[in-house]
Amino acid sequence: METTQYGHLLIDGFGVSLRKRRGRILILSKGEKKEIPMKSVKEVVIIGKAALSSELLKALAQSGTDLLIATPTGRPVARLIPAKAGGTARNRYEQYKSLEDRRGIEIARAVIVGKIRNQASNLSYYSKARRMDEELSSELYDAAQQLKREMEELKNEEFPDIDEARKRIMARESKCANIYWEKIASIMEEWKFRGREKRTDLEGNVIDPVNLCLNVCYNLLSAQIWKNVLRFGLDPFLGYLHVERPGRISLVYDLMEPFRPMVDRFVFSYLRGMSPSLFSSNIVSGTIASLRSRFFSDFMNWRLDYKGRKLGMETIMFLYVRDIVSFLRGGKEPTMPYIPW
């Protein structure tokens, strides 16, 4: 268990019990006790097996402290939603109405433009870092330029309705993803990375380290976007790009798109200097536990320029979703987060 600088209390173990004690969170684990002031905790993340008292649950809800329950691979399972959840009914009403006008199309376009821009930035970053290998550096640079051209075309493309927009935007996103991951594979050869695989786990004899790390961090990213979607009273199940399915948080998957390349760079940095042997079946759980911890301590505190200010990722995500809501309510188009190269 640990508490990050921003206030994430990460419970990543077994046999842990959490209770409320006079404005503090009492943590009992393996005969040891630890108390943390509740006011210093902004989110409790339960990844291991833990028991929480009903009094603590009530206190978390009343104080507005977020509670996330996730699997070992970071996939969000549940969140605590207080009766006094944030946002207004109008936010959700405007979200529903936006599927019938240009607002839905522009949000769908904006999040994928933001994603492609950040993918191009990553390729430019790795091209610069590999200048000693002129051929590889040139290939990465050319691919980045190709993504930028695709991005500009998407910016200017016209769509008659949201259904046509969804189909054509996702087709372009898929094309750009193929270009991007082919070049990423060329710089991750030592890890035997061949491309994206969305389904990986911690079981079995053959573990794909890169895809496993990406999927864990994408899952944790989705949980953070989900948190902010709920804060503003939006419907997480109604998206603009991802097809609706029962239980699928489609809007969350839409809005996390610009952040995915940021997660990519974080994961590749995490793997730098590590050995693939750390992902052998008998010790991989410990390696992934370290990654989960680093996601909250490092990635969520990563500072980037956003709308003229240098802000932490936690704050950027909040302001980004607030921008989406403002646009739905008649404001200017939202600013997409950007990672410089």
UniProtKB/Swiss-Prot annotation:
E.C. code: 3.1.-.-
Q: Which GO terms describe its molecular function?
A: DNA binding; endonuclease activity; metal ion binding
Q: Which positions are annotated as binding Mn(2+)?
A: 173, 242, 257
- Is-annotated flag, keyword Cell membrane? no
* Cited function: CRISPR (clustered regularly interspaced short palindromic repeat), is an adaptive immune system that provides protection against mobile genetic elements (viruses, transposable elements and conjugative plasmids). CRISPR clusters contain spacers, sequences complementary to antecedent mobile elements, and target invading nucleic acids. CRISPR clusters are transcribed and processed into CRISPR RNA (crRNA). Acts as a dsDNA endonuclease. Involved in the integration of spacer DNA into the CRISPR cassette.
NCBIfam families in alphabetical order: cas1 (TIGR00287)
User: Which PANTHER family is this protein grouped with?
Assistant: CRISPR-ASSOCIATED ENDONUCLEASE CAS1 1
Q: What family does the entry list?
A: Belongs to the CRISPR-associated endonuclease Cas1 family.
Name recorded for this polypeptide: CRISPR-associated endonuclease Cas1
Q: Which organism is it from?
A: Korarchaeum cryptofilum (strain OPF8)
Q: Species lineage, top-down? A: Archaea, Thermoproteota, Candidatus Korarchaeia, Candidatus Korarchaeales, Candidatus Korarchaeaceae
